[in-house]
Design a protein with these regions (language model features):
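Histidine-rich, glycine-flanked metal-binding segment
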Residues: 1-38
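A generic local structural motif
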Residues: 17-18, 29, 73-77, 100-101, ...
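Metal-associated gating/positioning segment near the N- to mid-region
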Residues: 35-105, 123-127
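Short, structurally constrained coil/turn elements
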Residues: 23, 104-109
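Short, solvent-exposed loop/helix junctions and linker helices
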Residues: 1-2, 69, 148
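Metal-coordinating catalytic core of metallo-dependent amide/deamination hydrolases
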Residues: 107-175
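Active-site-proximal beta-strand/loop segments in catalytic clefts of secreted hydrolases
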Residues: 17, 32, 82, 90-91, ...
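Divalent metal-coordination and catalytic microenvironments
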Residues: 6, 11, 34, 42-45, ...
Length: 175
């Protein structure tokens, strides 16, 4: 529709009125007469800590958690500016929980984030951090790393995600 007024209070649409409403002295007016206004998009599967690139595998050896945290700030703002106002972040190093908290506190710009924190997988599953590495480089990942085998370890991993502040649980049962 054309010639409409959208009234927003504290980042929430309060009403949409026909015609151009007169603004009060304390109101901020953003003239969008030549623009199309639409609701924000929702992306149901993102990873705000990284992006797909040929360097992704080596970054696992050269980046520390702070590198992922700083990078995720940039990716969050880019995501918001692309029109996504809500995302479901389905696994990362755990930095994504702090990222969500920083956005919620207004410290950084980004979309509303619902995050799984770290995902959970079986040994050899999609999230097993030792996949593709020589045996002497593998280590022995467990529930804290996202690798859980059997009911007890799965319960432990889920409880840890809850304790860490995850909004949801992501389980990758296969490779």
């Amino acid at each position: 529709k054309k010639n409409m007024t959208v009234v927003v209070d504290k980042n929430k649409i309060i009403t949409i009125e026909t015609g151009f409403s007169k603004a009060g002295n304390a109101d901020r007016v953003i003239d969008l007469k030549t623009k199309t206004v639409m609701p924000g998009w929702i992306d149901m599967h993102v990873h705000l800590e990284f992006e797909t690139s040929p360097k992704r595998q080596i970054e696992g050896f050269t980046y520390n958690p702070a590198d992922y945290a700083y990078q995720s700030v940039q990716f969050s703002e880019v995501t918001l500016l692309a029109g996504f106002t809500t995302v479901r972040d389905l696994a990362g190093s755990g930095v994504n929980i702090s990222l969500r908290n920083a956005i919620n506190k207004g410290w950084i710009k980004g979309p509303r984030v619902y995050t799984a924190g770290k995902a959970i997988s079986t040994t050899g599953g999609h999230i097993d951090p030792t996949n593709g590495y020589r045996k002497d480089l593998m280590g022995d990942p467990g529930p804290l790393d996202g690798v859980a085998n059997g009911a007890d370890e799965c319960r432990q991993a889920v409880r840890q995600r809850y304790k860490d502040g995850s909004d949801l649980i992501k389980i990758t049962a296969t490779g």
